[in-house]
Each structure stands twice: as C-alpha cells, then as structure tokens.
C-alpha cells in the first residue's frame, strides 16, 4: 500500500474554494453589468462552467484526502460541511448565470448590479476570512471577515426587501 508522503492541507483547499467563489461572483458582476440580452449570455456560460468544475475538483480532492486521513485537523463532519458550503456558493452563482440564459431574461433590474457587487464583496470578505481560518481563535482579521460577510448579507437583504416592495 502506497503511503502519502505529504499531508493534505485542508485550509489551503478551503482558501481555493473561496477564491473560486470570488471569481464566479466577479463573473456574475460582469454578466449583470454588461447585460443587454439573454443571447449574449452564451459567451459567459463556458467560463462560469469552467470555474464551477474547478471548484468541484477542489471539493472532491478534500473528500478524497479525508477518507484515508487518520487525524484530520478538524472533525470530519466539520470539514465536509465547510467544503460543501463553499462549493455550494460557486454552484449557486453558476446556476444564477445559467438561469438568466435558460429563462430568456430580457430585462435586468437596475438594482441587480448593486446586488451582484454586494455578492462579490461578500466573496472577497469570505476569502479573507477563510485564509485566516487556521488561526481563527486568535485572528482579528478572521473575526473581522466574518463580521464583514454578515454585514454584507444584511445589506443584500435590505436591498432585496426594497426591490420586493
């Protein structure tokens, strides 16, 4: 049986997932800012799918490493939950971009640009927090990142409530 010579770094993998979420959010921002017709979205779909596939590969690598890992740095359930949650961010953003095309969207609400910007800022803040995750207990930037993500979520909720009025 071949032994692994290097220990898998789950924290680096989480950081990669967060960076891919930020890339997908940046693409969403580009899609929304440059939207004029659904047909034009076809040019963005391959890149959205490429990013999502890359995120899936990282997600799978985490699970592949976790199975034989005798003593992972966190509880197995926590690693699985974190990896799945970060992957879900990328999946949902890709799904949103694809939905614009699939539902043949003809009009983009003016607040959609602001909403996409908030989502992108949230993913950037998530990246910062995830990079500090190994030092979470003593890290001021980690705590600040978590607060920033929560603040941006509240900002997005306020914007969404205004749109629905």
Predicted regions and their residues:
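Disorder-to-helix initiation segments
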Residues: 1-17, 71, 75-79
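Short, charged/polar, low-complexity loop and linker segments
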Residues: 1-5, 27-41, 64-70, 98, ...
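A structural signal for well-ordered alpha-helices, especially hydrophobic packing surfaces
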Residues: 18, 22-32, 52, 59, ...
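Amphipathic, charged alpha-helical scaffolds that flank and support histidine-based chemistry
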Residues: 38, 73, 97-106, 113
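Hydrophobic/aromatic-rich structural module bridging two neighboring secondary-structure elements via a short loop
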Residues: 41-51, 61-91
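Extended, positively charged loop/linker patches that create polyanion-binding surfaces
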Residues: 103-138, 142
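Short, mixed-charge amphipathic alpha-helical segments
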Residues: 141-151
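Conserved small/polar residues in nucleotide/adenosyl-binding loops
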Residues: 163-165
């Amino acid at each position: 049986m071949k032994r692994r010579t290097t220990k898998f770094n789950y924290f680096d993998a989480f950081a990669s997932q967060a960076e891919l979420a930020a890339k997908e959010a940046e693409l969403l921002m580009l899609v929304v800012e440059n939207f004029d017709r659904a047909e034009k979205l076809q040019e963005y779909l391959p890149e959205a799918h490429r990013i999502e596939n890359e995120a899936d590969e990282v997600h799978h690598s985490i699970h592949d490493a976790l199975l034989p890992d005798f003593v992972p740095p966190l509880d197995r359930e926590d690693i699985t939950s974190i990896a799945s949650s970060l992957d879900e961010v990328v999946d949902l953003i890709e799904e949103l971009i694809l939905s614009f095309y699939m539902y043949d969207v003809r009009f983009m609400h003016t607040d959609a640009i602001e909403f996409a910007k908030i989502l992108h800022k949230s993913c950037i803040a998530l990246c910062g927090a995830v990079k500090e995750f190994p030092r979470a207990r003593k890290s001021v930037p980690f705590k600040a990142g978590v607060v920033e993500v929560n603040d941006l979520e509240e900002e997005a909720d306020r914007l969404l409530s205004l749109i629905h009025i």
